[in-house]
Amino acid sequence: MESMLVAGAGAAAVAAVGGLVAAAALADKLVAAPPPRKNRANPPPAVPGLPIIGNLHQLKEKKPHQTFAKWSETYGPIYTIKTGASPVVVLNSTEVAKEAMIDKFSSISTRKLPKAMSVLTRKSMVAISDYGDYQKMAKRNIMIGMLGFNAQKQFRGTRERMISNVLSTLHKLVSLDPHSPLNFRDVYINELFSLSLIQSLGEDVSSVYVEEFGREISKDEIFDVLVHEMMMCAVEADWRDYFPYLSWLPNKSFDTIVSTTEFRRDAIMNALIKKQKERIARGEARASYIDFLLEAERSAQLTDDQLMLLLSESILAAADTVLVTTEWTMYEIAKNPDKQELLYQEIREACGGEAVTEDDLPRLPYLNAVFHETLRLHSPVPVLPPRFVHDDTTLAGYDIAAGTQMMINVYACHMDEKVWESPGEWSPERFLGEGFEVADRYKTMAFGAGRRTCAGSLQAMNIACVAVARLVQELEWRLREGDGDKEDTMQFTALKLDPLHVHLKPRGRM
């Protein structure tokens, strides 16, 4: 979910440049903008920009995390940029990021969302709602009902079936055409989406009647609307976010796209919820997030709208972040046959001829290192969702004024040569030294830190690690010829631009 939020924030910055023609033409209106606050005694260094637009023109390459990291080489781990009328403090080191997320959390606990995300999420989803009573209640519910340790135990069988289905499909495709590369993403995302539906709604929905559409829609269309269209809408941008004093100007194309996406998402989610409420009314209780939320005591805490948004978030998150992590891991494994062999031998020694399960994970240190190294090099969230400084505070010795936006550049934290040797290389061995603990999720910033740590970190590790282990245990992986340098990402997200195509060879029985 958070990768979608970051995509939206980055996209808005780029699209704002396109809106500068209108802004420049209406420069006489700029006097309506509120005067900036008086500079504090010791502000962070500022990246030089242009009048009115600030640094927006420098972010047009659509990889803001890389631009931010480059600037940190000149201006240090903390600096200020201007995105139109908005000052933004960018943090580029783990040390400063943890200071903000843990030590200074009370001053920097709210979210600052672009217009598209405010409309789509209504600030009711766990990942982006402001810290407070509602956010704590919603996070507690998703931890107890779906993502926490005990909840994950009850969904374990579902996860195991999902991974077995992936392997069964891959074996079938290889047997039909052993010499052609196959598209791993197509196979994996289909089963991953089924898992997210079962966990969230209690069943792998094949179709649902949507009253607003006047027809039955298929599972593929459900996926397109709830996952694909939501991701694409997140990169739609409203330049008015960066020029709030011009908010009275129309942006009809943006408003149409967002409202259409919102309408379609709401219609399908409400149809899915209606179907499950009818099941529950018949006394057919199941282990699922919706069954948990609809229990009387918890149901009274939520409006129908909040229920719909929380379930939408749970479906999207499972089908997004885990895909990014697993696909990049298998890309690196296929690209590095020596490391693939090390992992395979570890699995053989630890598990013999038995299929890897979640119980085996503590006995597979190299597998855990592979997982953490992939999170470091290919973080699902290159830049964490923007936060809002609501009280004057200090960071790294600099004064930060209330009203400032703050962005944490996870990419720069993970590419810091002062912390990571040869950070551009994929080297799981770096996580096997004395300085690293497998259980320490804060060695990378991929799951955030402090009170806003990602709620889905345990599920991501359970699914990705077992999937990777089983995939290597049963199949030998080799990249399609010419794909060894295809490491670009899709727009502002961490999703691999080119779906992973691989040659697979079944291994002999162990």
Curated annotation (Swiss-Prot):
It is an enzyme of class 1 (oxidoreductase). One of its GO terms (biological process) is ent-kaurene oxidation to kaurenoic acid. It comes from Oryza sativa subsp. japonica. This is Ent-sandaracopimaradiene 3-hydroxylase. InterPro entries: Cyt_P450, Cyt_P450_CS, Cyt_P450_E_grp-I, Cyt_P450_sf, KO_chloroplastic. Pfam families: p450 (PF00067). It comes from the Eukaryota. Keywords: Heme, Host-virus interaction, Iron, Membrane, Metal-binding, Monooxygenase, NADP, Oxidoreductase, Transmembrane, Transmembrane helix. It is a single-pass membrane protein. Heme binds at residue 454. Its EC number is 1.14.14.70, 1.14.14.68. The gene is CYP701A8. One of its GO terms (cellular component) is chloroplast outer membrane. Gene3D superfamilies: Cytochrome P450.
